[in-house]
Amino acid sequence: AIGFVLFAYQANAAEIIPYGSFNYKLSNDENSSGKSYSKLEDNGSSIGVEVIDLGVEGDTITGFAKLEVGVDTDDSGSDTFDSKLAYVGLDSNMGSLSVGRQSHPFTDNIGGKTSIFNVYGGGSDWNYGSRSSNSMKFSTTQSGLTLDTIGIVDGSSTNTNAFDEFEVTISTKLLGSDISVGYADDVNSDISYWGV
């Protein structure tokens, strides 16, 4: 007798979310001679797609992915698109783990919170890095505290047994405000950064 074993499961339909922004600005500045001029230009337009809840019903681990590109709406040449984010990962009740081109927690949770003058270059604050390829990121939230970490392994360090760069931030809400503390270590330059 030949027996067949059938596995019954119900696959969750992954949620696919397309998104984008058209960001254009009109500014009035002065040149180096003090002469006023107006300029109309792209200010960071983007398009992307996010995929969440890739998994099987009842599973405690699900998948996710994101692909986002910057769109230079003023470009008449061949550099219209610029890679922003491109990653895949797994999510569980312990946290999420992802690999690819991702944003830096130090910038997301500390430096990026004070970048209020984006029109003029966002020079009001210092950011360690905004996005990096060749990265592995882990995030988890427990008891109101969120831990975000990223490690970059791009082969540029002479220390072959370690990450080339890594960061960690701990964040929470206090009296309605986001509070974060973070550490970033650039192994290549042998420089460490702290931020609050």
Task: Please annotate each region the language model reported.
Residues 1-196:
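Outer-membrane beta-barrel proteins
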